[in-house]
Amino acid sequence: MGYTCFCIMNTASSSSPACGVPAISGRIVGGTDAVYGEWPWQVAVTTANSLCGGSLINEQWVLSAAHCFDNSISPGNYKVSLGRYKFGESIASSVTVVVEKFTKHPNFIKPGDRGDIALVKLKSPVTFTNYIRPICLPNASVTFPSGMECWVTGWGTRRYGENLPSINTLQEVMTPLIDYKQCDQMYHIDSSTSSYTIIIQEDKICSGYAEGGKDSCQGDSGGPLVCEANGTWIQAGIVSWGDGCALKNHPGVYTLVPAYESWIKSYISDVKFVSDDQISGSPDLAPQHCGLSRNLYQASCVLICMNMTYA
């Protein structure tokens, strides 16, 4: 039993919100279910037979993993659900949009390769709400230090090999970052792969614990790995692959987003990227980095606390 608090923010303007700033916050440390509206950039990318995650980066574009998309399947057969909390259950805040096109990075050929990143254009733009908001993207200058605690979210399975449930609450887990060199060393422990063979490439970042226990899993692919800096959430990675789920010395592997700034910009000219200076908290470089006026970020917060019991 304990108190869970939600912060409902009332912005001073009805214009587009800043990226990476959820209207609702509240987290149960060590829990698994996310708070409704806590991760408003999280999307589900689905076909009749598949589920992946993704992140909203502006009104009409989503970032996901290349391995989630099959070139033999028409883009119109992919759908993107936004503002959703329980997968498989429609609510008033959620919308579903058909995909107009998807673009996979040319370096990607098969899972485990470099370039496991895809841009997804929605057939029509979405309206931002408290439950549908974009995530901030880091530019190529941004580095994410090992040990930084970040969050991964998705509707995937909780254990490797499980079938995806028909209705599943959005899950969240916090894990520390691991740089690709250290991660590569971990994957070589008790491995038959030669130590001279690179398993984790430089366009990746890992997140997890040496002892295992917390990780993304099946169905989470393409979803965001996000880190908080001065009240703004930045997407560090995209769920790419892993050996099982949450195994010892096998942390989750993510495509490193800042490595692909120029590629993303080549397709989306108006997407805004955050720099190291903006993340460091300079008073002149706060959330207005998304190209919006400063008065958008003058906000009041109504705090609602509920006494809840968890099994």
Segments (PLM) and residue ranges:
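Protease-domain processing segments flanking chymotrypsin-fold serine proteases, especially trypsin-like
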Residues: 1-63, 77-79, 84, 275-311
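Extracellular trypsin-like serine protease catalytic domains
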Residues: 20-29, 42-46, 148, 154-157, ...
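Conserved H-D interstitial segment of serine endopeptidase catalytic domains
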Residues: 21-25, 62-65, 69-110, 180-188
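Short conserved beta-strand and strand-loop elements enriched in small hydrophobics
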Residues: 43-45, 78-88, 137, 149-154
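Conserved active-site neighborhood of the chymotrypsin/trypsin-like protease fold
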Residues: 62-66, 114-139
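Active-site substrate-binding loop(s) of clan PA
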Residues: 106-109, 125-174
